[in-house]
Amino acid sequence: MAEKEHYERTKPHVNIGTIGHIDHGKTTLTAAITKVLADKGLAKAEDYADIDAAPEERERGITINTAHVEYETEKRHYAHIDAPGHADYIKNMITGAAQMDGAILVVAATDGPMPQTREHILLARQVGVDYIVVFLNKTDLVDDDELVDLVEMEVRELLSEYDYPGDDIPVIRGSALKALEGDEEQEKVILHLMDVVDDYIPTPERENDKPFLMPVEDVFTITGRGTVASGRIDRGTVKVGDEVEVVGLHEDVLKTTVTGLEMFRKTLDLGEAGDNVGALLRGVNREQVVRGQVLAQPGSIQTHEKFKGEVYILSKEEGGRHTPFFSNYRPQFYFHTTDITGVIELPDGVEMVMPGDNVTFTVELIQPAAIEKGTKFTVREGGHTVGAGTVTEIDD
């Protein structure tokens, strides 16, 4: 009997998603991509109905419907997310349930940019999706090419408005439905779209290549050896002998050296992103490190008390608040592994925030936290999650 082929993970991995206004064809395009690539043996064809009936997931206390499909091109392996409802998109992007390295913005040529088109572009910008490729869908339903040119111009202007390179972004025209139905010309368009995605959306930096960061979950003493801080490595790597800083909750940064590493009670040479490790810290007292701080590569992260965040506020049905809140609302902000109280200041012209809204507001924390642009947090009241957000700007 012939030996089974061994699966080699040789292709770089990229996370992408479809964004855009309702009924512009996001899910149809997702289905078409899987079908066309399946014909080349690079994917499993996913049915529109299967993608649309996305399973519920819970991410940081919030229920979100998301469909995950995967496929390959000749060059890469992709995980692609598609969310059925508009609210699911917002929640997905803000909570980071699906971290996207790039997105395909779907705009129907029959409609042009619509309110959710704008909202998804804004959110993509806020949460750090730096690369967008445009698919102008349903072009077969528009008789006049000049009208399609006009829609393309509008989309480019809208992207430029949110600091995307609107003039340079690739725009592909086609019909996702025709491709799904087997039209040869449109199948070629889908293959061309994926070539563009391959080339235009860069391969992200691997988590291991980023500066070391580990939120501290627990601290304990090993008699005769010293203090151990344990947690899950968020990014980067750490090895015995590395200098690290203990950052957060105090203005002062504590410098120390890792003198031992353990995982599953065994000693470890190198801890990588995703590993749960205990790090023995030289010359540190048990009282000097607490849950909620982070261990980090020296100089890579600072503490801040004031920031702007893009936040989704849970609706009453999702277990959130039943009433709106106003400026000076003081909930807890759960960063990394701990709650810190903060005072909210709403932007000019926003009187109050209703359950189910998404909003950008400024927060002043009562203790400094180790945060940076892109740090995720939840908003909690008495231990209950009432919102989730992303730091979009540091203000102090």
UniProtKB/Swiss-Prot annotation:
User: Region G5: which residues?
Assistant: 175-177
Does the entry feature the keyword Transferase, yes or no? Answer: no
Keywords recorded for this protein, A-Z? Cytoplasm, Elongation factor, GTP-binding, Hydrolase, Magnesium, Metal-binding, Nucleotide-binding, Protein biosynthesis
Among SUPFAM superfamilies, the record links this protein to: EF-Tu/eEF-1alpha/eIF2-gamma C-terminal domain, P-loop containing nucleoside triphosphate hydrolases, Translation proteins
Superkingdom field: Bacteria
Q: Tell me which residues bind Mg(2+).
A: T27
Q: Where is the tr-type G domain?
A: 11-205
Ranges where the record places region G3: 82-85
Q: Which GO terms describe its cellular component?
A: cytosol
GO MF terms held by the record: GTP binding; GTPase activity; translation elongation factor activity
EC number(s) recorded for this UniProt protein: 3.6.5.3
Q: Does the keyword Metal-binding apply?
A: yes
Region span, G4: 137-140
Record's Gene3D superfamilies?
A: P-loop containing nucleotide triphosphate hydrolases, Translation factors
The residue range of the signal peptide is: none
Q: Where is this region: G2?
A: 61-65
Recorded hits in PROSITE patterns, A to Z, give: G_TR_1, G_TR_2
Q: Which InterPro entries match?
A: EF-Tu_GTP-bd, EF-Tu_GTPase, EFTu-like_2, EFTU_2, G_TR_CS, P-loop_NTPase, Small_GTP-bd, T_Tr_GTP-bd_dom
Record field: catalytic activity: GTP + H2O = GDP + phosphate + H(+)
Per the record, which residues fall in region G1? Answer: 20-27
User: What does the sequence similarity comment in the record state about its family?
Assistant: Belongs to the TRAFAC class translation factor GTPase superfamily. Classic translation factor GTPase family. EF-Tu/EF-1A subfamily.
Assembly: Monomer.
Q: What does this protein do?
A: GTP hydrolase that promotes the GTP-dependent binding of aminoacyl-tRNA to the A-site of ribosomes during protein biosynthesis.
Protein name per UniProt? Elongation factor Tu
Lineage, opening ranks = Bacteria, Bacillati, Bacillota, Bacilli, Lactobacillales
